[in-house]
């Protein structure tokens, strides 16, 4: 059953999911909304993608967790993944966001991130809470993501849609926060959204 305030944006690589998230973060911060969670920006060297970092949206703390240069760890595509590095940033960032923020952002929930069972557990905790959340996920079917999608508003993004979708999400989230704040609750706990 769909829960109010949970959003998942799905799309192919390069479709603009992360760009949409960055635009949304700018809008939320400018409006005074406290937002936390994680981003997983790609790392490029001379135009070639070499890996991914994980970044705590609230504190800015980050670390590389997937790289073509790593020699150990599970493989996803051409990258080796350090689950330990990922968890050292992602788990406290998401727990902190759940406790301290009005909106949680998770960019993204994909194969590399789901190598961490602890990550999946905290994502489920966020999903079961009432906090407004926005996440991104790949277009391919992944069982764990399908379960989350069943209780979310799913938005399919195509190249060129980032601005339009970020505006839509900002307006939806602003409306939800307005209702929550007017009912004198400290924050809308329990809603997860994926972009």
UniProtKB/Swiss-Prot annotation:
Pfam families: NTPase_1. The keyword Magnesium does not apply. It is an enzyme of class 3 (hydrolase). ATP binds at residues 11-18, 103-110. It catalyses: a ribonucleoside 5'-triphosphate + H2O = a ribonucleoside 5'-diphosphate + phosphate + H(+). Gene3D superfamilies: P-loop containing nucleotide triphosphate hydrolases. It comes from the Archaea. GO terms for molecular function: ATP binding; ATP hydrolysis activity. Disulfide bonds: none annotated. InterPro entries: AAA+_ATPase (IPR003593), Nuc-triphosphatase_THEP1 (IPR004948), P-loop_NTPase (IPR027417). Keywords: ATP-binding, Hydrolase, Nucleotide-binding. Coiled coil: none annotated. Its EC number is 3.6.1.15. Transmembrane segments: none annotated. Has nucleotide phosphatase activity towards ATP, GTP, CTP, TTP and UTP. May hydrolyze nucleoside diphosphates with lower efficiency. Belongs to the THEP1 NTPase family. This is Nucleoside-triphosphatase THEP1. It comes from Korarchaeum cryptofilum (strain OPF8). The lineage of its organism: Archaea, Thermoproteota, Candidatus Korarchaeia, Candidatus Korarchaeales, Candidatus Korarchaeaceae.
């Amino acid at each position: 059953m769909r829960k109010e305030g949970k959003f998942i944006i799905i799309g192919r690589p390069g479709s603009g999911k992360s760009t949409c998230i960055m635009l949304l973060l700018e809008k939320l911060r400018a409006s005074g909304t406290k937002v936390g969670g994680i981003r997983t920006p790609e790392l490029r060297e001379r135009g070639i993608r070499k890996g991914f970092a994980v970044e705590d949206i609230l504190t800015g703390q980050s670390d590389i967790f997937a790289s073509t240069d790593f020699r150990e760890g599970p493989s996803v595509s051409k990258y080796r993944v350090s689950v330990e590095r990922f968890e050292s940033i992602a788990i406290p960032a998401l727990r902190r966001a759940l406790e301290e923020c009005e909106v949680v952002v998770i960019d993204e929930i994909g194969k590399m991130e789901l190598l961490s069972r602890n990550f999946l557990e905290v994502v489920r905790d966020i999903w079961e809470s009432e906090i407004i959340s926005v996440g991104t996920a790949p277009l391919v079917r992944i069982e764990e993501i399908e379960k989350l999608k069943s209780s979310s508003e799913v938005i399919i993004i195509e190249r060129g849609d980032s601005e339009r979708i970020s505006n839509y999400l900002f307006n939806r989230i602003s409306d939800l926060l307005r209702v929550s704040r007017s009912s004198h609750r400290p924050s809308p706990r329990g809603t997860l959204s994926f972009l």
